[in-house]
Design a protein with these regions (language model features):
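Conserved catalytic core of sirtuin-type NAD+-dependent deacylases
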Residues: 2-245
Length: 245
């Protein structure tokens, strides 16, 4: 996202860089379905039927309908306390959010700089040119909608089996962190999970997740807060502001 970062007066050169890496657990706390859920939108669909290039080729109508449903679900949800706490870090830090989530709840909570690794529900792209990306107004993509280049539009989502074009940029951002916060992710989806390897070895990493994420790749000083995002992130945000700003 473009635009100036919000900075308190006379503190721009003191501000530490906080990189926040978020996963499905943050969205789940707003009531959004995730592909690991046993219920919700994903319960009636196999991933290979709605989230692969082959599915788009062989059953375009089902794929478009599925993402219309996801988009409509997203528009009916609100950012939770975890999203708001992450956005609130900008009061004291230079913050970049890297998310595996395809919803826009970080932006709606007020985060200024969000990198979406796996695409965005609020956008469509040309089936011919992956760089030709357009916003979608509302939740419904028409089956016959075309891009400015005349090609059929598709969801701006990184399907399973496709490259993750924003990963290199995300790795660069991770390498600039003075503090790293990892929220609501099992650290099991690659290449996204490997972002923690790009953080400088002396940088503290704070992990907020109620489960047992795979931390084998983390060699940094690690603090694990065993809470859901909406509960643990507000507490951690206050701690970071108190100890590091």
């Amino acid at each position: 996202m473009d635009g100036m970062r919000r900075m308190p007066p006379n503190r721009s050169f003191e501000m530490k860089k906080v990189v926040v890496f978020t996963g499905a657990g943050v969205s789940a706390d707003s009531g959004l379905s995730t592909f690991r859920d046993a219920d919700g939108l994903w319960a009636d669909y196999r991933i290979e039927d709605v989230c692969t290039p082959e599915a788009l080729r062989d059953n375009r109508a089902q794929v478009v309908d599925f993402y219309n449903m996801r988009r409509r679900e997203m528009l009916g949800k609100e950012p939770n306390a975890g999203h708001r706490a992450i956005a609130g870090l900008e009061e004291c830090f230079d913050v970049d959010v890297i998310t595996q989530n395809v919803d826009n709840l970080h932006e709606r909570a007020g985060s200024s700089h969000v990198t979406h690794l796996h695409g965005e529900l609020t956008k469509l792209r040309s089936s011919r040119d992956p760089e030709l990306i357009v916003p979608i107004d509302g939740w419904e993509q028409r089956l016959d909608a075309t891009a400015p280049d005349g090609a059929l539009l598709r969801p701006h989502i990184v399907f399973f089996g496709e490259a993750v074009p924003m990963f290199e940029r995300a790795a660069e951002i991770a390498g600039t962190a003075d503090l790293m916060v990892v929220v609501g992710t099992s650290l099991a989806v690659y290449p996204a999970a490997s972002l923690v390897r790009y953080v400088r070895p002396d940088v503290p990493i704070f992990l907020v997740d109620p489960g047992n994420p795979d931390t084998a790749m983390i060699r940094n000083p690690l603090t694990h807060i065993r809470s859901r995002a909406a509960e643990g992130m507000p507490e951690l945000a206050e701690r970071l502001k108190s100890e590091f700003s």
